[in-house]
């Protein structure tokens, strides 16, 4: 695994050829990491719980991905459920949602893979084969 990357002036790591954000205890993240390793993909590993994404990173990824913002939420997570976000999110602005996501990496759907021109949220092998 190569640990090279370029950090932009504002601290956002978007110049990484590929950054892999995951929670090591998550079985989906483990499966995704095995896929990356088996396919000899170089990436920078980032523990999403210890080093959660910033508002600026999330905003950039959201815009680059073309996905609805709700796709960035870990809707099956305990924190999402305990905060009753299913009912609260529809009334929140995008800015409020992005700020909330940035408060705790466990709110973010994982894994997240970012590259120079793509963002993938969740592990779908067919999509990863196409984009990575």
What are the functions of these language-model segments?
Residues 16-34, 44-46:
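Local sequence-structure signature of Cys/Sec-based thiol-disulfide redox active-site neighborhoods
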Residues 42-52:
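A short beta-strand-loop structural module common to alpha/beta enzyme folds
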Residues 50-132:
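Thiol/selenol-based redox catalytic cores and closely related redox-interacting motifs
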């Amino acid at each position: 695994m190569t640990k090279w990357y370029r950090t932009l002036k504002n601290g956002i790591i978007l110049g990484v050829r590929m950054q892999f954000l995951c929670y090591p205890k998550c079985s989906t993240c483990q499966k995704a990491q095995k896929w990356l390793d088996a396919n000899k993909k170089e990436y920078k590993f980032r523990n999403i719980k210890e080093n959660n994404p910033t508002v600026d990173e999330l905003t950039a990824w959201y815009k680059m991905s073309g996905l609805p913002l709700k796709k960035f939420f870990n809707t099956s997570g305990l924190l999402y459920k305990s905060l009753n976000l299913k009912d609260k999110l529809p009334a929140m602005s995008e800015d409020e949602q992005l700020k909330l996501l940035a408060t705790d990496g466990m709110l973010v759907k994982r894994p997240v893979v970012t590259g120079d021109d793509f963002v993938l949220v969740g592990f779908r092998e067919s999509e990863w084969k196409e984009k990575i």
